[in-house]
């Protein structure tokens, strides 16, 4: 192993093998006050968003956001594919192009893991309460996340460029360097992980724990405990902790914000890797200023995502967006959906409840035969969801309507859908043909 040599407090560090070398794990008191204030602002806004939205909206958006989170976390790694390719992969429709199929499998792996881990987290929260979020800081939890992310991938997908293999859930057994940063020796990782858990799991609940979450994200990436997949694990870990504290309600995730300014995300992570920048930069081995800048950025990203979704879910604005989606369906897609469905659809969104089919048809103001065909078209196009062939209906969010319902939430999916619609509208291949033909 090649060792990076750096000058710290008149001592030369040949390699990282002791937990004191990645101090500070939290900012000192003078730097902490504004961070706690920002964390409090985030918590208040996130709590208000969750309280204002109904369970139905949370359920529908959660499914959509899993695909979006998968797209963005893989984009940060340079392993993303088109949103439509993700949708196909969820239907077990994989490309004949080997590299695209590999990226599709990575996307599905994240979606499956996020759903599974959220379910397990909710189960543990019901049984153990606050101890569950503390458990997420354990080596056991980290290896669980890594194992779930990679366990279903074929052998070829787990092979790195140097020929070595990633073992799902296994702490690395060799030294690694990531860019300019040489991670701790593999023999010392248990000690680093124990210290990481001790500090962050021991932080008091509230604003301090949110600040600790941001710091923990960097220090986890810095340790690089796995041979590969550390960024994916760190981002999923952050997502799950925010959910465990009841701050996301399935309505937002920091993963979108991290990827929206990917260069800044990576630059600040790297800057926080640096050694202390002088006598005024804290008392630890690593830069406190860099850690503070990273925490500020993470809190800003989360707050921005909360504010964005708060605007998107405003009931008044949604009426106009539903109307635009229905107008497009009527004039362009000609799917049988009619604009008279606006009133019952907006009612379902605003109340986050359900309507019997007869009541829904009555609210359209259409005759029974036309109302019935309209209802069927809405179900076929995914504007409505139901649990049975004759059951009540509820508001749903089809991906093709995303650009109308939640503009700019997932711009790449909007562009992808517009391209697909353009191909179909210009007399190109049918949608079923597009599903069979891999898209480059």
Model feature map: region roles:
Residues 1-440:
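FIC/Doc superfamily catalytic core
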